[in-house]
A protein has these predicted regions:
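A structural signal for short hydrophobic beta-strand segments in well-ordered beta-sheet cores
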Residues: 154-155
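N-terminal glycine-rich flavin-associated loop
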Residues: 98-118, 144
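Short, solvent-exposed loop/turn elements at beta->coil junctions and helix N-caps
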Residues: 70, 139-143, 168-169
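A short core secondary-structure module
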Residues: 160, 164-205
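A short, Trp-centered hydrophobic/proline-enriched beta-strand micro-motif
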Residues: 130-138, 182
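Conserved protein kinase catalytic domain
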Residues: 85, 108-111, 124, 180, ...
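Amphipathic, small/basic residue-rich leader segments at the start of a protein or domain
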Residues: 1-102, 118-129
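Active-site-adjacent elements of ketosynthase-type condensing enzymes
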Residues: 141-151
Length: 205
């Protein structure tokens, strides 16, 4: 049997999270996610309500805990993150308030590890601050998230790449300042080596 008990200091953080989410975050769902109102991460009224909550989370040392300390997080392990996400999953706005909203969380890690200095300055820094949102574009209609049947291709044309294909279920695409898109660049390579990730500005035609 799995043992999900944790050290007293971290349990105190979990207890604080439960109370904070119940008292401060869950009410946002009643205001901004009521029937007939779509979840909109660019809603100015919602953002005005979220900002002070995010600042309190930062003061508690619980902002973006999946990230390493160099990126402003705590570098927590999977069990600790699972216990936190169990609490945050009770509300739509919880992950946004705590800086761990997908796909921003994963995109931040990709940029931190593989991004250029220019990309980090333009996209990673504001993403970590919660000033912009991003999109991860992988799923295709003919195969879902099974990369073995992906058809979207990227072909180099001089100094540029031409991407041709169709994606759907690209979370946050309508609001994203940038997308990270998965495309085939070497169709003859083994499945795990035939793809590349492309960072695409959100205003690209």
């Amino acid at each position: 049997m799995w043992d999900f008990s944790t050290e007293p200091e971290f349990q105190q953080k979990l207890d604080w999270m439960k109370q904070f989410v119940r008292d401060e975050v869950e009410p946002m769902d009643l205001v901004f996610n009521r029937p007939g109102h779509n979840f909109d991460v660019t809603d100015k009224r919602a953002l005005a309500a979220v900002r002070p909550l995010q600042e309190e989370v930062r003061r508690q040392g619980l902002w973006a805990c999946h990230l390493t300390p160099e990126l402003g997080g705590q570098g927590y392990g999977q069990v600790q993150l699972a216990l936190m996400n169990e609490i945050l999953g009770a509300t739509k706005w919880g992950p946004r308030v705590f800086g761990c909203q997908a796909p921003d969380s994963g995109n931040a890690e990709i940029l931190a590890k593989f991004g250029t200095a220019e990309q980090k300055a333009r996209y990673l820094a504001p993403l970590l601050e919660g000033e912009i949102v991003s999109c991860f574009s992988m799923t295709e209609p003919q195969g879902g998230s099974d990369p073995r049947v992906f058809e979207t291709k990227a072909v180099r044309d001089g100094d540029e790449w031409v991407i041709d294909g169709y994606k759907w279920f690209s979370s946050q695409a309508r609001w994203a300042s940038f997308l990270i898109l998965m495309a085939v660049t070497d169709a003859k390579a083994p499945v795990g080596e035939r793809f590349s990730m492309f960072l695409i500005p959100g205003d690209t035609p």
